[in-house]
């Protein structure tokens, strides 16, 4: 995807989306590395779409639209109806609302649904999932690629932890690293560095011990 123009691509995507769903579209946005302006050549295009309601037929139609793009294997994201979005688990929804750059519509009305307890649960859930997955991977799968993915996921727990502790939500991972604790910065630095096979044991230890501390501190 050299010389890939995300702005032009989004315009084409938006036109096709409107042709397909028209005024049923309640929200369309971009999240992930492209939304933050931190994309690399291998980054996914992470789109968020909310319709008035979503049937399985709608998903089939949307799937056909995705398949019409040569970049279809790079497109991922979140699709839901309004009702599902309004009733989504708050600690999970919070990240979506804060991290998505709007193109059509807005998610601002959802921000009033959240409180500090929802943010804490988001941090705790993220740490618990990382602890379990990293332990399982170290003991059983022993998959370096899995560990790379876990460190990427850990960045979002770092970001939400910083948000809970300071009230400041920093979208950019690069900028975030300048404002977090030393231990959190270590997680971010490892997530952005190259992995070697001999890093597996030490980096597994670092992530497990970091997640363990968060679970203990933020258990409620």
For each of these PLM feature ranges, what is it?
Residues 23-31:
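Short, glycine- and small/hydrophobic-rich beta-strand elements in well-ordered beta-sheets
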Residues 46:
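N-terminal loops that bind phosphate or other acidic moieties
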